[in-house]
């Protein structure tokens, strides 16, 4: 039977492997330093893109290439005030969101203290609907909620017609809009 242990190395072969190991280790350190440098440059570039994008979106409240020029053509003056109230949405950040590696939330997390527990270790929330294990839940299911609404409209129409109370829902359905004649007569 064949021996799978591989070639036997003597003391001389082991001594020759140490310089090769040290050379590879030094090469690995250089590559890791190069990777860190590239990551820093990439982060700086992505931050620059984010800042320029923010500046562009804030300086063009009436209309821009991303949100469209509807407000620009309408000439509305309330757009800037509305933008300040709502803020810039991430959906408009086309360029900074296109990067796979850019994550502004990771930068905010790195600034928070490390004593906080990560989200994956948070306790599982307990729903109150599971507390009643003996009987049925009082929470409506999607089918029971929609089925009840369909029947309730018929009930409302019947009760409002019988009681004489005018309801705005049934009132608008019962009255028909009169046809306006502008002089043209159909024959």
Curated annotation (Swiss-Prot):
Q: Which GO terms describe its cellular component?
A: NuA4 histone acetyltransferase complex; nucleus
Q: Low complexity: which segments have biased composition?
A: 104-129, 136-150
InterPro entries of this UniProt entry?
A: Eaf6
Q: What Pfam families does the annotation carry? A: NuA4
> Which residue intervals make up region (Disordered)?
99-187
Primary residence: nucleus
Q: Any coiled-coil ranges, and where?
A: 20-49
The subcellular localization recorded is: Nucleus
Q: Which domain of life is it from?
A: Eukaryota
Q: Which BP terms in the Gene Ontology apply to this protein? A: chromatin organization; DNA repair
UniProt keyword terms in alphabetical order: Chromatin regulator, Coiled coil, DNA damage, DNA repair, Nucleus, Transcription, Transcription regulation
The record's comment on protein family reads: Belongs to the EAF6 family.
| Role according to the record | Component of the NuA4 histone acetyltransferase complex which is involved in transcriptional activation of selected genes principally by acetylation of nucleosomal histone H4 and H2A. The NuA4 complex is also involved in DNA repair.
Q: How does it assemble?
A: Component of the NuA4 histone acetyltransferase complex.
Classification via PANTHER family = CHROMATIN MODIFICATION-RELATED PROTEIN MEAF6
Protein name, per record? Chromatin modification-related protein eaf6
* Source organism of this protein record: Neurospora crassa (strain ATCC 24698 / 74-OR23-1A / CBS 708.71 / DSM 1257 / FGSC 987)
What gene name is listed for this protein? eaf6
């Amino acid at each position: 039977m064949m021996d799978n242990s591989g070639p036997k190395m003597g003391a001389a072969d082991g001594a020759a492997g140490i310089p090769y190991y040290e050379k590879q280790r030094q090469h690995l350190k250089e590559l890791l330093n190069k990777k860190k440098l590239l990551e820093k440059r990439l982060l700086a570039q992505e931050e620059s893109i984010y800042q320029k994008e923010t500046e562009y979106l804030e300086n063009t409240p009436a209309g821009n290439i991303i949100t469209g020029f509807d407000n620009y053509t309408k000439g509305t003056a309330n757009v800037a005030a509305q933008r300040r109230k709502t803020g810039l949405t991430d959906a408009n950040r086309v360029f900074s969101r296109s990067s796979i590696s850019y994550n502004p939330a990771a930068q905010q997390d790195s600034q928070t203290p490390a004593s906080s527990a990560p989200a994956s270790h948070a306790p599982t929330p307990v729903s109150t609907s599971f507390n009643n294990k003996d009987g049925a839940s009082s929470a409506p299911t999607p089918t029971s909620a929609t089925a009840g609404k369909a029947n309730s409209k018929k009930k409302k129409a019947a009760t409002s017609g019988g009681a004489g109370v005018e309801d705005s829902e049934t009132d608008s359905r019962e009255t028909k809009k009169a046809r306006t004649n502008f002089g043209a007569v159909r024959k």
